Curated annotation (Swiss-Prot):
Belongs to the ZipA family. This is Cell division protein ZipA. Essential cell division protein that stabilizes the FtsZ protofilaments by cross-linking them and that serves as a cytoplasmic membrane anchor for the Z ring. Also required for the recruitment to the septal ring of downstream cell division proteins. Residues 132-155 are annotated as: Disordered. It is a single-pass type I membrane protein. It comes from the Bacteria. The lineage of its organism: Bacteria, Pseudomonadati, Pseudomonadota, Gammaproteobacteria, Alteromonadales. GO terms for biological process: division septum assembly; FtsZ-dependent cytokinesis.
Amino acid sequence: MEDLQLVLFVLGAIAIVAVLVHGFWSIRRQQPKSLKDSPMGNFYKKQAEKGESIPKRIDAEGFDADGIGAVRVRKAGELAPNNETPTANPYLKQEVKLETKPQELTSPEFKAELKQGLKPELKVEAKHEPIPAQPDFSLQPPVAKEQHRGPKVSRQEPVLGTQVPQMGQSHAAIVAQKAAEQEQALRAAPQQSALFEENEHQADHQEEAFVEQAAEDELGEPRDVLVLHVVAKDGQQLNGAELLPCFLTLNFKYGDMNIFHRHVDNAGNGKVLFSIANMLKPGVFDPDNMEQFSTQGVVFFMTLPCYGDALMNFSIMLNSARQLAEEIDAVVLDGQRLPWGEFTKQDYLHRIRANA
């Protein structure tokens, strides 16, 4: 077993060394050869040792393959030939100036050469041409121009520095004035529409109040009362904790006389259609203490005549009583505390038609 471990250790070390050697060899192989190692580098080195100059191919203009021409040495203070005049062409050939020794900036030769180099200058004369007339982009139609026709006047091109004619100024003033008027009209439009809507809403509210007041005057004193009882079964009572959620689900709202009312609007607005009271005296509810409240039954009652359609209101009251009885496991009775039936329903409908 120990021999096997030793063999494996040796093989692993050999493999690691082989991987390292192969990695170094790959890196060495991928590196570019330097100029010294290249064949051309040896060629240039041998030529330099022998003292021989490397032949260069020069074209007809005096430039070699690298674009370098012959070196021209110019002495300090030497003037340029007369045929060499500076021009504005940026593509002129530039000559390399080699000096034997650096010049001082304060030397007289440098100043003379600087003056000679600054003498030729390019003078560009600015030629002012008349600016062409711009087309008229005004939004006004050409009707106004046709109405004020007059003698034809030759149109002159505007010159730089001249003033704009007075007619253009008046036209721009008219356009600005009309734009300001339109902006004022647009600003005033929402205010006028809001004022109109407010007046319209006030008129609608006044009309509704007038209709309601007229309906109250027409109803007069109640002539009959339709009553339905929702009573607990024998030996049981109705708990307030169960009654209150049912009242709210049936869209009843606590209000006048400390009882719950069903209004024209499900949100509790408008006239009262019918109401719910406690069957036991004093017949009121206390919403803050409904959890401690219990009773034997509740009473649904609707006065005749009533607001709206009496048949529809009675149908809603009957359905509400049945839903409440089903939710709390109670019984629906009529005004005489007798079981509700078809005969009692026909009697109630006859009473509604008689007081319509």
